[in-house]
Design a protein with these regions (language model features):
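Electropositive
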Residues: 1-8
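Exported/periplasmic cell-wall-interacting domains
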Residues: 6, 13-178
Length: 178
C-alpha cells in the first residue's frame, strides 16, 4: 500500500529500474522504496511503455508507488527540488485543489501509438499535441477550484499540516495511484 503521511523527496532519476523488471521515467523518490513515476516501460525508451499497464492508471496496480502520466511526473521532476515536502493522504470525497484528472486510454491494437504515453512532450510522440500540454484532461471546474483555493488562502504555495486540516485528500493521488 502507498504510505500516508508527510515526506520530503530525497532523490530523483531520469529513469529508474522498477520491479518486474521494468523502468519508470522521471521518477522521484517519496520515501523508502516508494516513488512517483510513470507507467512502467519495458526498456529505457519513450516509445516502449507497457501499454496494457497504461490503461490501469487510476487503479491500484503496483506495490505502492504512485504512477502518473508523463506530463504530471515530469512536472514534479522539473519543478520540485530535492527536499520538496510531499503529503499523501486518503479522502476520496475531496479531490483536492486540482481535482481528479480525467482518464486517457490507449488502444492496444494501435501499434503506431500504443508504446507512447499520450502526454509525453517528446517531439517524436505520435499523439495529438493537446494531450502533451498537461492540461487537456483537467476540468474547468478543477481549475476554478484551484484558483479559488489560491485566492481564499487554502493554498499559498507552501504546504504544512495546519494548511491541510479539514481540506486535504489524496484523491489527487488516488486517481493515478498504482
Amino acid at each position: 500500500d502507498t504510505p500516508l503521511g508527510f515526506f520530503a523527496t530525497p532523490v530523483n532519476y531520469d529513469w529508474r529500474l522498477l520491479a518486474g523488471p521494468s523502468y519508470g521515467q522521471y521518477a522521484t523518490r517519496i520515501w523508502d522504496s516508494y516513488l512517483f513515476h510513470t507507467v512502467p516501460y519495458y526498456s529505457q525508451h519513450k516509445d516502449d511503455i507497457e501499454y496494457d499497464q497504461f490503461n490501469q492508471l487510476g487503479t491500484q496496480a503496483s506495490l505502492g508507488c504512485i504512477r502518473l502520466l508523463v506530463c504530471d511526473v515530469k512536472w514534479i521532476y522539473d519543478n520540485c527540488p530535492i527536499g520538496t515536502r510531499v503529503v499523501i493522504y486518503d479522502n476520496a470525497d475531496d479531490p483536492g485543489p486540482m481535482g481528479k484528472p480525467g482518464t486517457i486510454y490507449t488502444d492496444p491494437a494501435d501499434e503506431s501509438k500504443r508504446g507512447w504515453d499520450p502526454t509525453d512532450p517528446d517531439s517524436a510522440n505520435p499523439w495529438d499535441a493537446a494531450f502533451r500540454s498537461g492540461t487537456a484532461i483537467r476540468s474547468e471546474a478543477a481549475w476554478n477550484e484551484w484558483n479559488d483555493a489560491q485566492n481564499d488562502g487554502r493554498w499559498n504555495g507552501s504546504i504544512n499540516p495546519t494548511d491541510l486540516q479539514g481540506w486535504s485528500t489524496d484523491s489527487s493521488v488516488e486517481g493515478t495511484r498504482g
